[in-house]
Amino acid sequence: MFADLQGLGLTPQEINKVAYHRQNLGNPFINQEGKPMTIYATGIEIPEGKNKGKFVSVPGYVGGRIVTDEDQLYNIWKKDIQSGKWPVYETADQLNARDAWLHQIMDKDMAQYFEQQRLKQPYQQMESLFYQDPFLTIK
């Protein structure tokens, strides 16, 4: 269903983020603008351990809700961070650049997924101020 990730230069940890996103496509968080969110990637500075002072990108969409507190996110994902599940970068700029690339991949996934869902739905007339389907108005 989705594009193959090979050849895109992703690390195994970045692929884990795309997999997390793909798992949540069927149940995204809908933000205030009505847009679906599947991961809410959040960069946090690692406060302890071998990667202390480096930056990790973790999902902020957890358990059907958005978590923005960095300390809370670190506690939620601590074991996964320490085990190397999520990508770690030397600087926040490196993290932001890679997340921007991953976001492009995820945006393509989302567009493809929702287009497929739209095609599965029965025909529904879209409302328009300028057009009305004449076949639906005949009585």
Over which residues does each language-model region extend?
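Charge-dense, intrinsically disordered terminal/linker segments
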Residues: 1-139
